[in-house]
From Swiss-Prot:
Cellular component aspect of the GO annotation: cytosol
Key word Cell wall biogenesis/degradation present: no
Any Gene Ontology biological process: cobalamin biosynthetic process
Keyword flag Cell wall biogenesis/degradation: no
InterPro entries named in the record: SAICAR_synt/ADE2_N, SAICAR_synt_PurC, SAICAR_synth, SAICAR_synthetase, SAICAR_synthetase_CS
Molecular function via GO: ATP binding; phosphoribosylaminoimidazolesuccinocarboxamide synthase activity
NCBIfam families linked to this entry: purC
Catalytic activity: 5-amino-1-(5-phospho-D-ribosyl)imidazole-4-carboxylate + L-aspartate + ATP = (2S)-2-[5-amino-1-(5-phospho-beta-D-ribosyl)imidazole-4-carboxamido]succinate + ADP + phosphate + 2 H(+)
Species of the source: Magnetococcus marinus (strain ATCC BAA-1437 / JCM 17883 / MC-1)
HAMAP family: SAICAR_synth
Domain of life assignment: Bacteria
Protein known as: Phosphoribosylaminoimidazole-succinocarboxamide synthase
Family: Belongs to the SAICAR synthetase family.
Pathway this chain belongs to: Purine metabolism; IMP biosynthesis via de novo pathway; 5-amino-1-(5-phospho-D-ribosyl)imidazole-4-carboxamide from 5-amino-1-(5-phospho-D-ribosyl)imidazole-4-carboxylate: step 1/2
Amino acid sequence: MQKGEKLYEGKAKVLFATDDPNMLIQYFKDDATAFNGIKKGTIADKGVVNSLISTRIYHILEKVGIPTHLEELLSPREQLVHKVEILPIEVVIRNRVAGSLARRLGIEEGTELARPLVEFYYKNDELDDPMVTIDHAEVFGWAKHREIEEMIEMSLRINDILIGFFANIGIDLIDYKLEYGRLAVSPSTLVLADEISPDGCRLWDMETGEKLDKDRFRRDLGGVEEAYQEVARRMGLEVPGR
């Protein structure tokens, strides 16, 4: 597959065209950002680690029938992915109280929820990604009613799978974000896109409560690189050069 021109560069990834108009190359960067780009830095080998972690997770999800944009891993930090039209909505799944939920409601971080909480956020950096309702998404045309139902159903299935997966390696899945898109070759087909990695998940060690995710960068806790590497190690992934 031939890599073509750069089509888009975001905070953590770059998308390149290929010789197939319906396929893209997704390149994972080492750049780290927080608070919608206000805080910036670099985490050594983050792109490689996130690419490998996300690839492993998406392969697991594909095996149980969750459609994703991933086709294959091309190199440690590059994936071949299906071209999609990303919906301007992030789905956040919460299993415990943390982050903005703790701040908004004044509930102690780490409090276990009676059931997974599904939240929607409008993807807009200028507005700081505000939380929105299902009605907002439908009224403003961000997603169709059927797509919203599919996103909720898929997200809860993904949650069931990932809770068990991470528990088996001693990690609590606290919360995480998901992004979905419409396949370019079949716009009626919704697939999981973007990535699932320590960049977009809160992952706590089950025994110690140690944070193994980007909160270490957000909160200046140190050991960011080591935390990402630890997640990869527990997943049995070999990071080149390590």
